[in-house]
Amino acid sequence: HLLDFLETGEICTIVGTALDNATESVETEPDHEKRLIRVAVYAQNGFVMLRFENYCAQEVELGADGLPRRNTHGGSDLRSVRAAAEKRGGTMTLHWENGWFTLRVLLPQKS
């Protein structure tokens, strides 16, 4: 019930885009043991966090807008995820470190 306050389309935009991008990224990994995707959704301190992580050996450089510089990890699609988060007063952040790409969507929790 953590996401009940979101419209179905918003959930599809966030979750669908995140999983599509993660899947596309790990498909190119030659080592099948490293084709890993982790997903977590939880509430904490009045917020709902959706976190998507995938193994990504090649560093993902982010531009000034916080999106990938190269057309990797669905740069244009991630704009729609950001828009969905911001519509609900939330944020989207991306991070790459030690072979892991992370997409986080933080939304204020509605009662």
Where do the language-model regions lie?
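Glycine-rich nucleotide-binding loop
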Residues: Q58, E97-R104
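Conserved short strand/loop->alpha-helix "switch" segment adjacent to the catalytic nucleotide/phosphoryl-transfer site
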Residues: H1-I14
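A short, flexible helix-to-loop-to-beta junction within the catalytic ATP-binding CA
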Residues: T23-D31
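Glycine-rich/acidic phosphate-handling loop/turn and adjacent ATP-lid/helix
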Residues: G46-R79
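Short beta-strand/loop element within the Bergerat-fold HATPase_c
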Residues: K34-G46
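Detector for a conserved hydrophobic position within an alpha-helical segment of the HATPase_c
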Residues: A85-E86
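Glycine-rich ATP-binding loops of the HATPase_c
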Residues: G89-G99
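Conserved polar catalytic motif of the HATPase_c/GHKL fold
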Residues: T13-E24, S80
